[in-house]
Amino acid sequence: AVLMDLEPGTMDSVRTGPYGQIFRPDNFVFGQSGAGNNWAKGHYTEGAELIDSVLDVVRKEAENCDCLQGFQVCHSLGGGTGSGMGTLLISKIREEYPDRMMLTFSVFPSPKVSDTVVEPYNATLSVHQLVENADECMVLDNEALYDICFRTLKLTTPSFGDLNHLISATMSGVTCCLRFPGQLNSDLRKLAVNLIPFPRLHFFMVGFAPLTSRGSQQYRALTVPELTQQMWDSKNMMCAADPRHGRYLTASAMFRGKMSTKEVDEQMINVQNKNSSYFVEWIPNNVKSSVCDIPPTGLSMASTFIGNSTSIQEMFRRVSEQFTAMFRRKAFLHWYTGEGMDEMEFTEAESNMNDLVSEYQQYQDATADEEGEYEDEEEDLQAEDM
């Protein structure tokens, strides 16, 4: 892993924490100034100064791989460093390794809890980058993670450690097939092929099962139907969007542990038959399952869920509304223009995000018999473009 930040504080706490010894000391790359929750500082000024030393470390790590699958980037979209410098790093890695997978775990600003007032700006500018440069984005949200800890895991005061634990379970689940043997293998590229019907629509909801409160683990029977039921449960989605408000374009289920692949397939078909109205009918067989033999430590079975649902537009729509409310009055814009940004960039990011929302809406409303019409329209558009 390579850890980067524009201020030394968080790095020091990682280094002195319980896991400080597992990271190579050279892989901590940090600046001194901080980004002050300013996307422009992370992307254009402070971040741009630090990015070359980060890329050197990334290059060293990549050269150590015998078969580099891709990159996983964890960042938040509300602050300055994760959003501004995170997207800068993604675009630089994209330039250098154009054919490797780029997977991001992006923490969106929460609906009710706001850390800083300029979150909508930072998030919108980041989404603008992620649409173009990332292959797969797992959309996370602190509030949804907090709800899972509170409601399902029965933690009265969840800490960031508890929230991170959920994210790490998902990260581990997504990559387990690369790291362990399995009956039905999948990797990041297969995942992308199966989950992304249109290149721009690569923002996924993630879920994990079994989620059990610490006290009641030993009373819980782990069966494939139980895992299936829990991982499709909308309460366990790690972002503030409700899959019942949209339809699944595609989904993927990754099971871990000793189990029969036949049973997994039966359960997946069962889910699709019972909830057929929540799946678009013009993509047949749109749920992919994979099975990996080695379960996570302390569990006999586990499953990770990744869904490409049109309801993710709720997240974008919410951020976009907040963005517009501020941008209309040009609030706080001088922080960004002062770092050399142009208002035009904001306008572009805003329209890109709104386009994304309307694309999701278009495919949510599409039916099988309309598909031909869209193709005709697209051909007309292409003819016009020529």
Curated annotation (Swiss-Prot):
Annotated binding of GTP, by residue: E7, S76, G80, T81, G82, N142, N164
Q: Which GO terms describe its biological process?
A: microtubule-based process
Q: Which domain of life is it from?
A: Eukaryota
Per the record, the similarity remark reads: Belongs to the tubulin family.
What is its subcellular localisation?
Cytoplasm, Cytoskeleton
Please describe what this protein does.
Tubulin is the major constituent of microtubules, a cylinder consisting of laterally associated linear protofilaments composed of alpha- and beta-tubulin heterodimers. Microtubules grow by the addition of GTP-tubulin dimers to the microtubule end, where a stabilizing cap forms. Below the cap, tubulin dimers are in GDP-bound state, owing to GTPase activity of alpha-tubulin.
Q: Does the keyword Isomerase apply?
A: no
Which SUPFAM superfamilies does the record associate with it? Tubulin C-terminal domain-like, Tubulin nucleotide-binding domain-like
Gene name as annotated: TUBB1
Annotated Mg(2+) binding lies at E7
Q: Specify the protein name.
A: Tubulin beta-1 chain
